């Protein structure tokens, strides 16, 4: 188990969260992204994720370093699952701790946006009537676009 990794087995939230806990941290924000059944009115049967693992893990660690630079004192753990995932399975876990909650919340949101922008992970959405590969890389994180639908 590593602080930044790609896995094929179900993600155990508490084990990864514990990477971020120490006596200096007053807040831990944990985000788990799950496979949802409905997307834009289309029913999903399951998802299949693929990644270029060596590069993906390097990019996850890069995001952790970026967070540490933007919010000093934070500790980040990021784990993404690949392979077939069923409805409600955890696809991604991001845990960020900091001395105070505001930085932990902001850094956690930053992490998920950066994953979508720079980490070489692709998902295949399998629906009742077809399937389609989706890429996540969207370019450089832009604080001004935060909160806008993609």
UniProtKB/Swiss-Prot annotation:
GO terms for biological process: Mo-molybdopterin cofactor biosynthetic process. The keyword Repeat does not apply. It catalyses: 2 [molybdopterin-synthase sulfur-carrier protein]-C-terminal-Gly-aminoethanethioate + cyclic pyranopterin phosphate + H2O = molybdopterin + 2 [molybdopterin-synthase sulfur-carrier protein]-C-terminal Gly-Gly + 2 H(+). InterPro entries: MoaE_sf, Mopterin_biosynth_MoaE. Substrate binds at residues 34-36, 44, 100-101, 116, 123-125. Pfam families: MoaE (PF02391). PANTHER family: MOLYBDOPTERIN SYNTHASE RELATED. Heterotetramer of 2 MoaD subunits and 2 MoaE subunits. Also stable as homodimer. The enzyme changes between these two forms during catalysis. Belongs to the MoaE family. This is Molybdopterin synthase catalytic subunit.
């Amino acid at each position: 188990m590593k602080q930044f990794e790609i896995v094929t087995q179900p993600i155990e939230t508490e084990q990864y969260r514990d990477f971020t806990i120490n006596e200096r941290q007053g807040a831990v924000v944990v985000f788990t992204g799950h496979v949802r059944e409905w997307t834009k009115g289309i029913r999903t049967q399951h998802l299949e994720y693929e990644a270029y693992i060596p590069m993906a893990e390097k990019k996850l660690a890069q995001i952790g370093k970026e967070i540490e630079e933007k919010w000093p004192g934070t500790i980040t753990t990021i784990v993404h699952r690949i392979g077939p995932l069923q409805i409600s399975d955890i696809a991604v876990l991001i845990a960020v701790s900091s001395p105070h909650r505001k930085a932990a919340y902001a850094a956690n949101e930053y992490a998920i946006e950066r994953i979508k922008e720079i980490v070489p992970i692709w998902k295949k959405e399998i629906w009742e009537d077809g399937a389609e590969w989706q890429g996540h890389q969207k370019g450089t994180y832009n604080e001004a676009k935060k909160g806008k639908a993609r």
